Amino acid sequence: IRNSEKQHIWVGMARETAHQLGTPVSALMGWVDWLRENPEKTLDIVEEMNADLNRLNQVSERFSQMGSTPKLEETDLSELVKTVVDYLEKRLPSKGKSLKLVNEITSKTNIYANITLLSWAIENIIKNGIDAITQERGEVRIRLRMEKEEVRIQIHDDGKGVEKKDLKNVFRPGFSTKNRGWGLGLSLTQRIIQDIHRGKIFIKQSSPGSGTTFEIILPT
């Protein structure tokens, strides 16, 4: 790798780390403000604050596992997705927007996975969908289809969609259409799915104004 490319990757990783820290830190600040206004409801919020503290710990774990050989273990995919959705649902942008996460994966589905990294990959796709919704109302829907020796996870958002000219670049390190993006989230997601879980990830459908559907294929 050329020095300029190495520098770009290091800068991108540093910024991606800051981006990963942003959600739990912002949430913790929000919970503190909420507690100041509602001191009688402390117990209701402690669990969510604890979830954000755990998330801060997960950020370092995620990056350390990317630099090692992660272990795969038998995992209930439905429970993994539910945990990701439950966390993000309580932290959806609310100012001027009405957003929904719809999780249609309910039946137990066992696969071999690294829970920390696969959760990160699915979270990245869902957050990408949330960011793509620029209108007042929108949703991100998660579905699962079982086939012979694989599972197919579809994550669809009804956001702005991807321009045809950009489709081939979405997983390229450094590519981003977001003003605050650094273009490593989807690149890391692709590596987690393909290199670590021996799966596939691609955009199944997308066009401006009609949203985007990502599909993840994982062996069972």
Placement of each model-derived feature along the sequence:
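Conserved DHp (HisKA) dimerization/phosphotransfer helix of two-component histidine kinases, i.e.
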Residues: 44-94, 98
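Conserved micro-motifs of the catalytic ATP-binding
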Residues: 68-71, 110-113, 177
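Conserved catalytic submotifs in the C-terminal HATPase_c
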Residues: 98-110
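Short beta-strand/loop element within the Bergerat-fold HATPase_c
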Residues: 139-149
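Acidic ATP/Mg2+-coordinating residue in the GHKL
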Residues: 157
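Short conserved segment of the HATPase_c
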Residues: 162-174
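Detector for a conserved hydrophobic position within an alpha-helical segment of the HATPase_c
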Residues: 193-194
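Glycine-rich ATP-binding loops of the HATPase_c
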Residues: 197-205
